[in-house]
Design a protein with these regions (language model features):
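Periplasmic polypeptide-binding modules associated with outer-membrane biogenesis and secretion
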Residues: 1-250, 259, 273-278
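Short loop/turn motifs that connect adjacent beta-strands in outer-membrane beta-barrel proteins
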Residues: 265-271
Length: 279
């Protein structure tokens, strides 16, 4: 075996009975948990170059008293493969010279499905910055050479239609005026949808400090192939503070003070402070 059992089992949700199992409950058999664990096992090998890894069989047996379950997983590990050639294919609406620097899968590396997935995401985000919000990128390994254990990887690009923003909407801002939110936006209506600008706008809304949660979505406009709306959903949180203090002086005796600060006065986005003192 290439990897010892302890290494392979450390990410399993199912676990053998141990000291902490009573508290964590991770020693209770579940078919769903086992299915997830087998998928994690498959990913473990694919991320380390074993492209022909397979699970040959899984046996689950129960003891006569039905108090314990034994699980045996038989696998075929295969050989480790390295990357030979990396290429782009499909409709490259964004120039190849701009996409190639995003290919983190490199010739000579041990093949990793995780790096392929990361590269898919980077390419989709780059296309999304040019208005191709619903682009699909699928990195595939092919042309496996069993003599030198190498494999080619090609990223197939399907950009889809370029889309534009019809309208930007807000929900959940019961106290805060839309205009306060709108001035933080870097994605604009009628402009091409830009994944990075939509996310930058979400970050700017979050940094206002008025909201505990800010979520962004870009649903398609019904009956349109090239229009989306941008939906920002927020959850408001308290944006003010109250303070009090007590002091003493020979001339005035005890001095009592209080201050109130509101960072989003009446939903306008303005900061207002009040201070009172009495002796």
């Amino acid at each position: 075996d290439l990897f010892d059992d302890e290494e392979l089992l450390k990410d399993f949700e199912l676990n053998s009975t141990g000291f902490w199992s009573f508290i964590k409950g991770d020693d209770k058999y579940s078919r769903q948990k086992l299915s997830g664990d087998l998928e994690r096992l498959r990913s473990y090998y694919l991320d380390r170059g074993y492209i022909n890894f397979s699970i040959e069989s899984t046996q689950v047996s129960v003891t006569p008293d039905r108090r314990s379950v034994f699980i045996t997983v038989n696998v075929a590990e295969g050989e480790q493969y390295t990357v030979n050639e990396v290429s782009l294919a499909g409709d490259l609406v964004v120039g190849e010279e701009q996409l190639e620097p995003l290919l983190i899968v490199k010739k000579g590396q041990v093949f990793s499905q995780q790096l392929v997935t990361y590269t898919n995401d980077l390419l989709k985000r780059r296309l999304g910055n040019e208005g191709y919000t619903f682009a699909e990128v699928n990195g595939r390994d092919h042309n496996a050479n069993d003599e030198d254990n190498t494999v080619d990887v090609t990223f197939y690009v399907e950009p889809g239609r370029k889309v534009y923003v019809r309208r930007i909407n807000f929900s959940g801002n019961a106290k805060t005026d839309d205009e306060v939110l709108r001035r933080e936006l870097r994605q604009f209506e009628q402009a091409p949808a830009n994944t990075s600008l939509v996310d930058l706008s979400r970050q700017r809304l979050q940094r206002l400090g008025y909201f505990s949660v800010v979520e962004a979505d870009t649903p398609r406009v019904p009956n349109s192939e090239d229009l989306v709306d941008v939906e920002y959903k927020v959850e408001e949180q308290p944006s003010g503070s109250i303070g009090a203090n007590v002091g003493f002086s020979d001339a005035s005796g005890f001095i009592f003070g209080a201050n109130v600060t509101q960072n989003n006065w009446r939903g306008s986005g303005n900061r207002v402070s009040f201070a009172l003192s009495r002796s």
